[in-house]
């Protein structure tokens, strides 16, 4: 639900699970790929299922 309305270039803070536990990352949203269930920041792709929370921090 929180992914709706996000646009490329938005500044977001994503809390997600990886191999080592939960971590947060703030960055510019590169793209949302619903077909692949991926959210991409500049240097990382995060699976939708791993996202615990996402906050919009600024608009492009």
Task: State each model region's role.
Residues 32-37, 56:
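Short, conserved beta-turn/loop elements at beta-strand boundaries and strand-helix junctions
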Residues 1-22, 47-48, 53-60:
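Short glycine-rich, low-complexity segments
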Residues 31, 43-46:
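Structural motif
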Residues 14, 37-43:
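SH3/SH3-like beta-barrel fold
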Residues 24-32:
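Short beta-strand-centered aromatic/proline hotspots
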């Amino acid at each position: 639900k929180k992914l709706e309305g996000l646009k490329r270039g938005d500044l977001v803070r994503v809390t997600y699970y990886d191999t080592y536990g939960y971590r947060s990352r703030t960055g510019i949203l590169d793209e949302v790929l619903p077909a692949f269930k991926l959210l991409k920041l500049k240097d990382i792709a995060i699976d939708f299922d791993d996202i615990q929370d996402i906050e919009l921090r600024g608009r492009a």
